[in-house]
UniProtKB/Swiss-Prot annotation:
It comes from the Archaea. Forms a complex composed of PxpA, PxpB and PxpC. The keyword ATP-binding applies. This is 5-oxoprolinase subunit A. Keywords: ATP-binding, Hydrolase, Nucleotide-binding. It catalyses: 5-oxo-L-proline + ATP + 2 H2O = L-glutamate + ADP + phosphate + H(+). It comes from Thermococcus onnurineus (strain NA1). The keyword Nucleotide-binding applies. Its EC number is 3.5.2.9.
Amino acid sequence: MKVDLNSDLGESFGRYKLGLDEEVMKYITSANVATGWHAGDPLVMRKTVRLAKEKGVAVGAHPGYPDLLGFGRRYMKLTPEEARNYILYQIGALHAFTKAEGMELQHVKPHGALYNALVKDEELARAVIEGITDFDRRIIFVMLSGSRPAEIAEEMGLKVAHEVFADRAYNPDGTLVLRGKPGAVIHDKELIAERVVSMVKDGGVKAINGEWIELRADTICVHGDNPKAVEIAAYIRRVLEDEGINVVPMGEFIR
């Protein structure tokens, strides 16, 4: 049994430092690197790719809305043509750095409000997926487990890593509980690890109302921008390995 651990990294910008990339990188297997539109800049992108190479961590692009002030967490209405080309542009930017460092670009995971918008907007999802296929049909698309965009990507011939979230509560329909609602974010590391093991080994987890929901867990997102990020990432990895689950980059088992 195999699973990937991913985290959103490279989200500093200019003089502003965000996240604990160097520490979190010790425990994950795939890094989603910001591509300059919601966070990140050329220097940060190259530094993050180099760090991933040094740590043996696979690299993926983490494109978002062009919204530095809002950190890509504010919805923007895009035409399909805009969405397709925005994604292609951002993937290409990160690919320049992975190529310069002798690395392959493993995956693409949309960021923040864009990620959430894809779940609700099939036309937008198709446009984003087309932007990915324009770049390389062999690349892995990381998307919310069981969601319609994941299905569309598979229908369009892309490899998909179904993603679950370590520290987030789920609605009965498999979507994430909005951050502002009570109980949306889980902070207890033992509970987080228990839920992660359930998702990987049992194929599901209890929703916020106690109802069991089925989830395919190819990759687990651990957030790298909170004070307990390193502690939680280390604990999750240790518990998974103690359970006999191999923690490896998604590219090793997503075919």
